[in-house]
């Protein structure tokens, strides 16, 4: 099973993000993220055998944190707006989200999981399959937009089920 650890976004944030999702959906070569799939990935685990699931859950239950606020501001692209592969909304935080991601990683590192890159807080809103100059226009248009604030009260172990129509994400366990 394909697993990752994430923070889901509140419905209020989903609503505020819908206009950019709609615009991205209208751009050739871009796949916008479905509103119900919006999340902040703390750690991607990849393909994991079911026999490891209990140990992953046990380690994640050891992660402790207090609820904290994050805000969503600005739009950018990885690696850059001129050659975008991923379109994202920035996540402003005071370090708590990064500490949570690092704590998740430290617990799961003991089970052999590795990061492919350092954690950079962001909310993916689209994936670019084919280069299209319209993407840079959208990034510019929303570059200083504010999408609201939410409180992080939990994180989730999620399964990603890949289908021809796009991924389906299923919560396996919620950690508070």
Curated annotation (Swiss-Prot):
Its EC number is 3.1.4.58. A motif (HXTX 1) lies at residues 39-42. Keywords: Hydrolase. It catalyses: a 3'-end 2',3'-cyclophospho-ribonucleotide-RNA + H2O = a 3'-end 2'-phospho-ribonucleotide-RNA + H(+). It is an enzyme of class 3 (hydrolase). The keyword Transit peptide does not apply. The active site is at 39 (proton donor), 122 (proton acceptor). One of its GO terms (molecular function) is 2',3'-cyclic-nucleotide 3'-phosphodiesterase activity. A motif (HXTX 2) lies at residues 122-125. Hydrolyzes RNA 2',3'-cyclic phosphodiester to an RNA 2'-phosphomonoester. NCBIfam families: 2_5_ligase. Belongs to the 2H phosphoesterase superfamily. ThpR family. This is RNA 2',3'-cyclic phosphodiesterase. The lineage of its organism: Archaea, Methanobacteriati, Methanobacteriota, Archaeoglobi, Archaeoglobales.
């Amino acid at each position: 099973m394909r697993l990752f650890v994430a923070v889901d976004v509140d419905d209020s944030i989903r609503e505020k993000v819908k206009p950019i999702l709609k615009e991205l959906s209208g751009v050739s070569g871009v796949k916008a993220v479905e509103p119900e799939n919006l999340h902040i990935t703390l750690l991607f685990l990849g393909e994991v055998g079911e026999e490891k699931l209990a140990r992953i859950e046990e380690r994640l239950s050891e992660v402790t944190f207090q609820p904290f606020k994050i805000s969503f501001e600005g739009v950018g692209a990885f690696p850059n707006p001129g050659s975008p592969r991923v379109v994202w909304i920035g996540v402003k935080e005071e370090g708590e989200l990064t500490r949570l991601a690092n704590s998740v990683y430290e617990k799961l590192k003991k089970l052999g999981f590795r990061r492919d890159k350092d954690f950079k807080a962001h909310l993916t809103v689209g994936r670019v399959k084919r280069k299209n100059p319209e993407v840079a226009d959208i990034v510019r248009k929303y570059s200083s937009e504010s999408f609201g604030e939410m409180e992080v009260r939990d994180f989730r172990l999620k399964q990603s089920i890949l289908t021809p129509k796009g991924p389906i994400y299923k919560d396996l366990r919620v950690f508070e």
